[in-house]
């Protein structure tokens, strides 16, 4: 009986944690998720790491938009991001930059 209670408690915590987790915007899932994740480095850096790198810096959103638009490595030493990821529009890039910078 104790095992069942512990199992249900752990399962409940897992589901509660996933419900509270930040979800990647649909455009990011479609055009960025092959190389990026919110919490984990994949091919490119985790977006929370990107947010931390630019936190409190003047012009952070503009810089991030420029990086996403032009492509490159940006000092991450993880490889080269292609320009515009997988064909994101200017509006999608601006929205994505805003999303990334709000991550904690």
Q: How would you describe each model-predicted region?
A:
Residues 36, 69, 101-104:
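Protein kinase-like catalytic domain
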Residues 23, 60, 64, 89-96:
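Stable alpha-helical elements in mature extracytoplasmic
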Residues 42-54, 70-95:
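Axial heme c-ligation environment in periplasmic c-type cytochrome domains
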Residues 15-28, 53-57:
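Electrostatic cytochrome c docking/interface patches
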Residues 1-23, 104:
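N-terminal export/targeting leaders of redox proteins
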Residues 31-38, 96:
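The canonical Cys-X-X-Cys-His
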Residues 22-23, 31, 46, 64, ...:
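Hydrophobic alpha-helical segments typical of transmembrane helices
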């Amino acid at each position: 009986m104790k095992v069942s209670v512990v199992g249900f408690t752990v399962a409940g915590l897992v589901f509660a944690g996933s419900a509270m987790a930040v979800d990647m915007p649909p455009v990011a899932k479609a055009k960025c998720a092959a190389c990026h994740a919110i919490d984990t480095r994949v091919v490119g850096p985790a977006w929370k790491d990107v947010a931390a790198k630019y936190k409190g810096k003047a012009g952070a959103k503009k810089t991030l938009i420029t990086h996403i638009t032009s492509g490159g490595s940006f000092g991450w030493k993880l490889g080269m991001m292609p320009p515009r990821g997988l064909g994101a529009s200017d509006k999608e890039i601006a929205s994505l930059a805003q999303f990334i910078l709000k991550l904690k």
